[in-house]
Design a protein with these regions (language model features):
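Bacterial Sec signal peptide processing site at the extreme N-terminus
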Residues: 16-36
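Short beta-strand segments enriched in small/hydrophobic residues
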Residues: 250-272, 420-422
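Extracellular/periplasmic periplasmic-binding protein-like sensory domains
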Residues: 377-382, 391, 399, 474-476, ...
Length: 649
């Protein structure tokens, strides 16, 4: 045995024993009678280390010794002793000459890194990039690649990698389905053109996103898809949420009670929502009449009686919820199928506690939900004849500013920006948004906490920007050099280089002051300009060309209704004629009322199919399993004196 080989083996043994020296020794039992049975030794890490020692002592075969030591490292991983396995592999790897052994050792090392920590993906990526071949370990390599892609939220690439793993087929099918559902329709369509092996999943995901809100067409498309992929695990084990959706009936909102504050301090907000609901109601009536007339004309031309499947007219009634107790509101809605509202959180909490379970509620605000909120399965049971109990069906729709902040954080991360700083006005709403942004940002492993600056007024704003961008320090250094130099010094302030994005939570007036200050504070010597992002609170439809110039290069999110070139131009023209001086806040509440009414028939299916979205005036809306509605807003950017739309996330 060479001296170096002996040292390697001794160190490997030491690594193995170092973590077991403190373990409790088992009491030896006296064997009274020798057994004639021959039992197979347990092939644990100790077994493989013993084999390595004994085999090498006899044969001096380095290859076989290394094989046993690698199996010992593998066994240590199985025994949940990854620290010990890593130490052994780091000692052993310099001695490995066979490429298969190198690949095996690197795989065990990478797997142990991920078992021990969520912050080692960079190490694992380097290990996988340096593999010289798969050598029969393709399934394990694919599993590691899938984990890397999940960490980067690259769901399509994760699904591609998962196909080559050796996990159970049904579990693999279900996992791929869950991951691909995180893609939007555009991403799915693009993937369908290139990823032939994922066709069953991609096609079904596209069918759900395109047709799930049109039950007859959805059923037809689903049957066609099943016939194209007979025998595929996704067909034989159709996703549970789709099975539930097929058994559900849409909400039949025959009589709707709307609870809004139509008097008192919230009267303006309540009236704006009411007008949005009425606009949607009247639009539905016109659409129904046009459809009915077309059906009648078709029937007359063919001489056949054609049954009409058009939506029946709904009865809708508005009640003033101001200064009313939950008991009074409950009495008002006793003869109605669906309740839309109330708007005030306290009233929502009190009303949901006493509202009969046969009433469907779409509250116009979001409240803290209890843990016993009914699940999708319970709601499904309640819609079947076998159910012996009723479950309350409640939904919650709000224009929550925190949702915008969370979307903004994810958007910036998708842009591969890693060090934003945040400026927020000194008021409760913008500070809540800043807190939500930072909390979402830090959910990503190893994310650097953004610096947060709160400003109180315009003067304070200028000081805070100068301090946060280190411009004040740069000015101070220039003055010091001027004092020391005997000649005239020409200096240009430089801003800090460690940030790559600026986030603003402020109103349009504050943003119009902030943006030029930030622009003036940025050094012309910088390699690239800093991106400036904001929420919908920084934009107003009343901004003229001069005001927009102050916001140039600002990227922000807002509901489609507030942006140019949306799909509801006739409705926008009517509202402008009726309310030419309406404030932005009331315009947004009008859009909320419009969407709330139109969402009613589809709420149940949206809740069952969490990946499904409904596009409305307020954004792309989905419903989570607790009945809470969430919005995704489109992105826009101010280019000189106009607003241009950007691609959705």
């Amino acid at each position: 045995m060479s001296f170096r080989a002996l040292i390697v083996f001794c160190i490997a043994i030491f690594c193995f024993l170092s973590c077991t020296s403190s373990s409790t020794r088992q009491t030896q039992k006296t064997i009274e009678k020798p057994s004639n049975e021959i039992t197979e030794k347990t092939k644990d890490s100790g077994y493989y280390l013993t084999q390595a020692k004994q085999n090498y002592a006899v044969t001096h075969d380095l290859y076989q010794r290394n094989e046993y030591l690698l199996q010992a490292a593998e066994a240590l991983q199985t025994e949940q002793q990854c620290e010990k396995s890593i130490r052994m592999l780091k000692v052993l790897q310099p001695e490995l000459q066979d490429n298969r052994h190198l690949t095996h050792s690197n795989l065990v090392l990478a797997e142990c890194f991920l078992i021990l920590s969520d912050e080692v993906f960079d190490k694992v990526a380097v290990i996988l990039a340096n593999l010289t071949g798969s050598y029969g370990y393709q399934a394990r390599i694919a599993a590691l690649q899938a984990q890397l892609q999940i960490n980067k939220k690259q769901w399509l690439q994760a699904a591609i990698a998962l196909q080559d793993t050796d996990i159970e087929e049904l579990q693999k099918t279900q996992t791929i389905w869950q991951w691909l559902n995180k893609l939007d329709l555009t991403e799915l369509e693009k993937a369908r053109l290139t990823e032939t092996t994922l066709q069953p999943w991609l096609q079904l995901a596209i069918i759900v996103k395109r047709f799930a809100l049109e039950p007859e067409l959805f059923n037809q498309q689903l049957v066609n898809w099943q016939s194209r992929h007979l025998g595929h695990p996704l067909v034989t084990s159709l996703p549970e949420e789709i099975q539930q959706a097929l058994l559900q009936s849409p909400i039949q909102a025959r009589r709707i009670a709307v609870l809004l504050p139509l008097s008192g301090r919230l009267a303006n907000q309540g009236l704006a929502i009411k007008e949005g609901i009425l606009a949607a109601y009247l639009e539905n009536i016109v659409a129904a009449e046009l459809h009915t007339n077309s059906v009648i004309e078709f029937g007359e031309s063919t001489g056949e009686t054609t049954p009409s499947n058009t939506q029946q007219y709904r009865e809708i009634r508005f009640f003033d919820s101001a200064l009313k107790t939950a008991q009074q509101l409950n009495a008002l809605v006793s003869d109605f199928d669906v309740v839309l509202g109330p708007l005030v959180k306290e009233q929502i909490i009190e009303l949901t506690a006493i509202l009969p379970t046969d009433k469907i509620l779409l509250a116009l605000n979001r409240v803290e939900l209890k843990t016993n909120t009914p699940t999708i399965e319970q709601l499904h049971m309640d819609n079947t004849e076998e159910s012996n109990f009723a479950v309350a069906e409640h939904y919650y729709f709000s224009l929550a500013p925190e949702d915008e902040a969370q979307q903004l954080a994810l958007h910036i991360q998708q842009k591969q920006l890693v060090r934003p700083i945040v400026f927020a006005a000194d008021n409760p709403t913008t500070q809540r948004m800043a807190a939500a942004f930072i909390a979402t940002w830090q959910e990503t492993p190893r994310a650097i906490q953004p610096d947060l600056t709160i400003f109180t007024d315009n003067k304070d704003m200028r000081i805070r920007v100068s301090e946060m961008l280190d411009v004040a320090q740069s000015e101070k250094r220039i003055k010091q050099i001027q004092m020391l130099a005997d000649v005239e010094v020409f200096g240009v302030e430089r801003n800090r280089r460690d940030i790559d994005a600026i986030v603003l939570f402020a109103n349009p007036e504050q943003t119009a002051l902030l943006n030029p200050i930030i622009e003036a504070s940025l050094s012309p010597f910088a390699r690239k300009s800093l991106s400036v992002f904001a929420s919908s609170r920084s934009y107003s439809v009343d901004l003229n060309s001069n005001s927009l110039r102050d916001l140039r290069n600002l990227t922000f999110a807002d509901m489609p209704w507030m942006l140019p070139d949306h799909n509801w131009q006739p409705l926008a023209k009517q509202t402008t004629q009726l309310w030419p001086q309406r404030q932005d806040t009331l315009l947004r509440l009008f859009a909320m009322g419009f969407d709330a009414y139109n969402l009613l028939p589809n709420l149940r299916r949206l809740r069952t199919l969490g990946q499904l979205v409904s596009h409305g005036l307020t954004g792309a809306i989905n419903v989570d399993d607790q009945g809470v509605l969430h919005r995704r807003l489109p992105w826009a950017q101010v280019a000189q004196d106009r607003v241009k739309l950007l691609a959705m996330d």
